């Protein structure tokens, strides 16, 4: 990222859970990314993030506290990059719909981790594996893509 550039808008799926809160804490003040959207269950949709979550990660970042939560639906989320903290029971289907809708999904779930066309990336070790995204997009017909971590 170029120094002085505007941080990219990102969304957090599963934002009210412990992993979602960790993503928010780690991204607070990040020079490349700005948490612009928080998404979780239907129960949290329409509520201010501060009211929808029981924050456990220290101080809730003020710029996220006032965000209005949405559902985990690509029609409700406009950010081009999505950090997914969804439980594996729902992550596979939801993350796939976001990738098909043109979003880059950075997933913490196991669902796509062993797929041969999905990069499992440890940035300090194998960032070059991101090149698999081209294969993934061609094979799956997605405009976006999914990248997993080793968790």
Cite the ranges covered by each PLM segment.
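N-terminal Rossmann-like NAD(P) cofactor-binding subdomain of oxidoreductases
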Residues: 1-151
């Amino acid at each position: 990222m170029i120094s002085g550039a505007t941080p990219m808008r990102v969304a957090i799926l599963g934002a009210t859970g412990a992993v979602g809160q960790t993503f928010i804490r780690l991204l607070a003040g990040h020079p490349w990314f700005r948490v612009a959207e928080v998404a979780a269950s239907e129960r949290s949709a329409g509520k201010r993030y501060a009211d929808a979550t029981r924050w456990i990660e220290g101080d809730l970042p003020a710029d996220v506290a006032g965000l209005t939560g949405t559902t985990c639906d690509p029609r409700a989320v406009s950010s081009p990059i999505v950090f997914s903290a969804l439980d594996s029971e729902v992550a596979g289907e939801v993350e796939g719909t976001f990738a098909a809708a043109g979003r880059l999904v950075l997933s913490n779930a196991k669902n796509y981790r062993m797929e041969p066309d999905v990069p499992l990336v440890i940035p300090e070790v194998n960032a070059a594996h991101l090149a698999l995204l081209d294969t993934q997009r061609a094979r799956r017909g997605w405009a976006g893509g999914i990248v997993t971590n080793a968790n």
